[in-house]
């Protein structure tokens, strides 16, 4: 279930999802509120699908969201005419659609500088 080196630490909660949003069909929201977690840092695959959906829902539920642009990825998509749109273009457009309204968009380095890790 987890890539080697990315396994959860002991007692770390795991929320297994079956749809694009990490909030649908899981107790993620309940866990976050119970533990008074109000700021989420979102990473993962893929940006135009699960990452975007989870980010939008988190913001709509009142959470503060930071999305790490370089810790997400997109794949080539084709439009209805079969024209391939590059992963870089897909990624940039999705980041722009989330920026400010749903999330603060940062690189991992920018985020780590802010939290002084």
Predicted features and spans:
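Active-site-adjacent betaalpha module
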Residues: 1-117
